[in-house]
Amino acid sequence: MNRIVLAGLLLILALPAAAGPDAPGCFTRTYDRAHLAQHPDQVVTAVTLRIYRPPPANADKYWFLAQFRLRGKDKPLRTSGICNETASGLRCLVECDGGGVDVVPRARDATMHLDRISGPACDEDSAQELTGGKDDRLFRLDRVNDAACAGMKR
C-alpha cells in the first residue's frame, strides 16, 4: 500500500505544474538574420516578456508586460495585462479585447503561443495589433536575468 501511495505521489510531482514557482521572471528572444531569412513570413524580430506578481491586493493573479519588435516598424508593440493560471500554464489577456497569449513558463525557458494581441488602447483607434501568422504563432523564449526587463513599463 505504501508503495502505491509513494508511486502516485511521484507521478503527481513529475507532472508539470500549472504556473508554479517558475512563472515569474523575464523571458526574451531576438531572432538573427539567418533565422529570419529561413522564415520570411515571420514578422516578429524580437520578443521580451515579463511575468510578475502584482501588489499583495491582487496576489492571486500574475501580471505581464510584453514587447514585440516587428519587421518594418520603428516602434515596438508594447502591451500588458493579467494572467490566469490554466492546466498547462498561463493565459495572459490584454484589457478591452486586446487578445492575449498562452505561456508555459519553465525553469530555463518559456513557450508562448500567440493568436492575436494588441497594445492597450481601450479608447484609441490607433492601437497596433499583431496576429499570429504562419511563422508568428509559437515562440520559444529564454529565461534571462530580471534586469533585462527592468525598463519595461505598464
Task: Give each language-model segment a name.
Residues 106-154:
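Glycine-rich, aromatic-bearing surface loops/beta-hairpins
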Residues 14-17:
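N-terminal signal peptide c-region/cleavage motif recognized by signal peptidases
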Residues 35-40, 74-78, 124-130:
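Acidic Ser/Thr/Pro-rich low-complexity disordered segments
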Residues 25-27, 82-84, 91-97, 121-123, ...:
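Sequence contexts marking disulfide-bonded cysteines in secreted/extracellular proteins
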Residues 21-59:
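Short, solvent-exposed loop/hinge segments that bridge or flank secondary-structure elements
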Residues 2-8:
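Sec-dependent signal peptide recognition
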